[in-house]
Swiss-Prot record:
The keyword Amino-acid biosynthesis does not apply. The lineage of its organism: Eukaryota, Metazoa, Chordata, Craniata, Vertebrata. This is Transcription factor GATA-6. It is linked to Rare variants in GATA6 may be a cause of susceptibility to atrial fibrillation, a common sustained cardiac rhythm disturbance. Atrial fibrillation is characterized by disorganized atrial electrical activity and ineffective atrial contraction promoting blood stasis in the atria and reduces ventricular filling. It can result in palpitations, syncope, thromboembolic stroke, and congestive heart failure. Residues 323-334, 490-499 have a biased composition (Basic residues). There is a cross-link at K429, K473, K484 (Glycyl lysine isopeptide (Lys-Gly) (interchain with G-Cter in SUMO2)).
């Protein structure tokens, strides 16, 4: 946005109260070629205790320029006072070197130079005037030529990333001043142009040179890359722009000493000149903050027509002062890894995909050799166990590979055999023992047979067959040759689970042959079974009839009937115990003999 002289006239906003400001100071005269010292630039700040105007802003007097300074272009009309005032109270700015008073806002000569470059850059087709600023800056070292011209060209052609220009996450000073003049509060204009900003490049590397007055050394070296100079900031703007973007008011007075806050966690140690890094990631060096809540703290971000593309990023930030560093701007953190936010509040804007320590650690390890992937390792060779072969048996598959004393591989079986026996495992399995009956050249010393189920030895130790050995063992004499048999007599063993035969009892249903002594001695006892009425009943019940083997004078008395229907013992023809035992024993013997 092209800014005119009238746009810089904050006395219009302040009214007549600016003329009555008691703490206004005139800018000292300077030589055209040599910039004033940072101490002399302290006149660019307003006292913290300045009078409050109707709009709630601190009133400061207008600057007085000498003839040489006034003879410059019309854009040389400098903005006096805090170019934006804190809408909620006194500015919270650090007393940086080169700033008079604890609340001073203009920090160094680069701040004034940045103001003067705004309209010139806008009217001169947005060219980079930072090279002139580098020559005028007393702290800017000599910068090498642009190393990455392609990135610089891309960044100079297209819109810059939101941290490329000095305005980091904050509005430009012109926008902050215009917003403060309009409504005493920041107004955000979101836009969709941010998505089109060089998507192929990380925003750390995108054009910090696209802004007209991004940094004082922008033409000489791209600020996104580390400089080769030993005393230059590792990620800084080459000493041109004060860190935090465009030498935020209240920042460190030295432009080169103030490291660019776009890289708040630089892995490099503090620089030799002893300048500490600002605590804030994106709102450092500003007395207000990234949210644009305090206009005076909005870094100058001289965008020259590029205000809208940064406003959307600023609008995405919360307005709760998350990025404000009210209490921590007064200290400088000596640690090279300063946090995003100095205040104890948590940043609501998460780290971007490129804001990882990996990006910076890769740059810091540029000289260190990268770890090279190992070639075929021992683990890989261990996996190729298919190529192994047992040196003893030739096996290629085994649950566990072992080694012998010479380091050769053995299968598990051969290795265990060698370990236990101290010998190599025999390759041919031993044949099963030949049956003793088939042993070659072996014959019985007694009967001269060659077949036997078991070979024995006699008292002299000579082998004998099983038959001769048992005979000698049992009888004490040699087995006679007449007993020799061609075949082997084997015992026909019966099954062990033989159903025991039922004994001769009243419950037995088997017909038992009776002895002759049990004929008619008890015919009177069995008279009840001989009646014509009970015999058919007993026979009809299916009870077996036991016939005696001997003679009987009465045919009816020769039969014993048992009633099986009720299982009761009806009668028996055996009276004496001797006869009972004589009847039971033959039955027991028959059961064992005939079974």
């Amino acid at each position: 946005m092209a800014l005119t002289d009238g746009g810089w006239c904050l006395p219009k906003r302040f009214g007549a109260a600016g003329a009555d400001a008691s703490d206004s100071r005139a800018f000292p005269a300077r030589e055209p070629s040599t910039p004033p010292s940072p101490i002399s630039s302290s006149s660019s700040s307003c006292s913290r205790g300045g009078e409050r105007g109707p709009g709630g802003a601190s009133n400061c007097g207008t600057p007085q320029l000498d003839t040489e300074a006034a003879a410059g272009p019309p854009a040389r009309s400098l903005l006096l006072s805090s170019y934006a005032s804190h809408p909620f109270g006194a500015p919270h700015g650090p007393s940086a070197p080169g700033v008079a008073g604890p609340g001073g806002n203009l920090s160094s000569w680069e701040d004034l130079l940045l103001f003067t470059d705004l309209d010139q850059a806008a009217t001169a087709s947005k060219l980079l005037w930072s090279s002139r600023g580098a020559k005028l800056s007393p702290f800017a070292p000599e910068q090498p030529e642009e190393m990455y011209q392609t990135l610089a060209a891309l960044s100079s052609q297209g819109p810059a990333a939101y941290d490329g220009a000095p305005g980091g996450f904050v509005h430009s000073a012109a926008a902050a001043a215009a917003a403060a003049a309009a409504a005493s509060s920041p107004v955000y204009v979101p836009t969709t142009r941010v998505g089109s900003m060089l998507p192929g490049l990380p925003y750390h590397l995108q054009g910090s040179g696209s802004g007209p007055a991004n940094h004082a050394g922008g033409a000489g070296a791209h600020p996104g890359w580390p400089q080769a100079s030993a005393d230059s900031p590792p990620y800084g703007s080459g000493g041109g722009a004060a860190g935090g973007g465009a030498a935020g008011p209240g920042g460190a007075g030295s432009a080169a000493a103030h490291v660019s806050a776009r890289f708040p966690y630089s892995p490099s140690p503090p620089m030799a000149n002893g300048a500490a890094r600002e605590p804030g990631g994106y709102a450092a060096a500003g007395s207000g903050g990234a949210g644009g809540v305090s206009g005076g703290g909005s870094s100058l971000a001289a965008m020259g027509g590029r205000e809208p593309q940064y406003s959307s990023l600023s609008a995405a930030r919360p307005l709760n002062g998350t990025y404000h560093h009210h209490h921590h701007h007064h200290h400088h953190h000596p640690s090279p890894y300063s946090p995003y936010v100095g205040a104890p509040l948590t940043p609501a804007w998460p780290a971007g995909p490129f804001e990882t320590p990996v990006l910076h650690s890769l740059q810091s390890r540029a000289g260190a050799p990268l770890p090279v992937p190992r070639g075929p390792s021992a683990d890989l060779l261990e996996d190729l166990s298919e190529s192994r072969e047992c040196v003893n048996c030739g096996s290629i598959q085994t649950p566990l590979w072992r080694r012998d004393g010479t380091g050769h591989y053995l299968c598990n079986a051969c290795g265990l055999y060698s370990k236990m026996n101290g010998l190599s495992r025999p390759l041919i399995k031993p044949q099963k023992r030949v049956p003793s009956s088939r042993r070659l050249g072996l014959s019985c010393a007694n009967c001269h047979t060659t077949t036997t189920t078991l070979w024995r030895r006699n008292a002299e130790g000579e082998p004998v067959c099983n038959a001769c050995g048992l005979y000698m063992k049992l009888h004490g004499v040699p087995r006679p040759l007449a007993m020799k048999k061609e075949g082997i007599q084997t015992r026909k063993r019966k099954p062990k689970n033989i159903n025991k035969s039922k004994t001769c009892s009243g419950n037995s249903n088997n017909s038992i042959p009776m002895t002759p002594t049990s004929t008619s001695s008890n015919s009177d006892d069995c008279s009840k079974n001989t009646s014509p009425t009970t015999q058919p009943t007993a026979s009809g019940a299916g009870a077996p009839v036991m016939t005696g083997a001997g003679e009987s004078t009465n045919p009816e008395n020769s039969e014993l009937k048992y009633s099986g229907q009720d299982g009761l013992y009806i009668g028996v023809s055996l009276a004496s115990p001797a006869e009972v035992t004589s009847s039971v024993r033959p039955d027991s013997w028959c059961a064992l003999a005939l079974a």
